[in-house]
Design a protein with these regions (language model features):
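Extended lipid/amphipathic-ligand handling interfaces
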Residues: 63-65, 94-105, 130-143, 167-184, ...
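Flexible, membrane-facing loop/turn or short amphipathic-helix motifs
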Residues: 80-89, 117-129, 154-167, 197-210, ...
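Extended terminal
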Residues: 2-19, 61, 234-245, 251-253, ...
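Alpha-helical transmembrane signal-anchor/signal-peptide segments
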Residues: 34-52
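N-terminal beta-strand/beta-hairpin edge segment
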Residues: 53-184, 251
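Loop-centered beta-sheet repeat module
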Residues: 2-5, 19-22, 150-216
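Hydrophobic membrane-insertion alpha-helices, especially the h-region
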Residues: 16-33
Length: 346
């Protein structure tokens, strides 16, 4: 009689193992996400406390932290900032705001804010700002960089005793990036700003031209660490005493038939006014500050030692004598323009 061999029971590990592994991973990821959420909440509280010590109070209405499973989202139904760093209190209020970071890429934060916004400024001024869309991004890891993109931003400035001014653009972009090629002691940050369809009342009044314009600016700011304190009198004074400079490597501004190309360097003088030297080329400018100049600028270059050569200028542009900002005044060559004195920034 033949003996029957016992049948080996098949292991069910491969049937249940993947499922159990998936459950373990899900539980571990959930634990990690809630841990990260707790860390973010704690860091927010610490950051708000540090800001309050520096004279800036942030208010995030109905604050919440969500985004499970792959994101961390900080949401505010309204966002407000009150700063006392300018003497008189400055308050900015916006609509809903959200900051988002991927759990697997926490070094990049995307920030979106809904309008409108309202700013209460010193001397009783009010600035109302609206936009179609507004988004920013901030990368913490080297090289640090920041970007802002706005569609149809529009601002209305109300100053007691003066006419209301409306500022705006069809599109605006701004990019900042720490320059990795400059010496670390320079603390250099590259800046690129472009705007299309601009409406800038002071420029309109200066040139007697209300047509929409375009601006393309590239520059490098040195001693940029001064502005980790924010943009306020203390930060500006720290930047000035550290011999900070704004190096304009490219400036192109068009407004109807008028165009200005230039470069140069700007600083703050001891009385906190903008100072420096610019190399400009221009075309189509009919007046400056109400003074009819016609073809005067083109003739100035030839009059001042033949410096009106257009060798370095774009086609159709006339190279101007050096433009200097000193002692609160604007000079073209030796001639002072009939403009209001430049006010101190702080």
């Amino acid at each position: 009689m033949t003996d029957t061999l016992p049948t080996r029971r098949r292991s069910r590990f491969w049937l249940y193992g993947p499922f159990m592994l998936l459950v373990i991973l899900a539980v571990a990821w959930s634990a990690f996400w809630f841990y990260a959420r707790g860390r973010v909440s704690a860091e927010i509280e610490n950051a708000l406390a540090r800001e309050a010590q520096r004279g800036r109070t942030w208010t995030c209405t109905d604050r919440s932290v969500s985004g499970f499973p792959f994101r961390i989202e900080l949401r505010c139904n309204a966002l407000a900032l009150t700063s006392t760093r300018w003497g008189d209190a400055v308050r900015v209020e916006t609509g809903p705001a959200v900051a988002v970071a991927q759990v697997y890429s926490p070094g990049l934060v995307i920030f979106e804010v809904s309008g409108p916004a309202k700013a209460t400024l010193p001397e009783g001024r009010l600035f109302d700002l609206s936009w179609k869309s507004l988004g920013t991004s901030l990368a913490w890891r080297s090289p640090e960089r920041f970007a802002l993109v706005a569609s149809e931003p529009r601002g209305v400035l109300t100053t007691p005793g003066l006419a209301t001014e409306t500022w705006g653009a069809a599109a605006l972009e701004a990019h900042l990036r720490r320059n990795p090629t400059r010496p670390a002691t320079e603390q250099a940050v590259d800046i690129a700003i472009s705007a299309k369809g601009t409406i800038l009342p002071p420029i309109d009044a200066l040139l007697g031209n209300a047509e929409a314009g375009e601006i393309d600016l590239q520059a490098t700011l040195t001693q940029a660490e001064s502005f980790r304190k924010g943009f306020n009198p203390d930060a500006l004074e720290t930047w000035r005493t550290a011999n900070g400079t704004l190096e304009l490597t490219r400036l192109v501004s068009t407004k109807g038939k008028a165009r200005v190309d230039g470069s140069g360097q700007l600083i703050l003088d001891q009385l906190h006014r903008v100072a420096g030297d610019l190399q400009l080329a221009a075309a189509g400018i009919e007046q400056i500050g109400g003074l009819r100049i016609g073809n005067l600028l083109g003739g100035l270059g030839g009059f001042l030692g033949g410096r009106g050569s257009n060798a370095g200028a774009a086609p159709g542009l006339t190279t101007l004598p050096p433009v200097s900002l000193r002692e609160g005044r604007v000079f073209i060559g030796p001639f002072r323009l009939p403009l209001q004195p430049l006010p101190p920034l702080y």
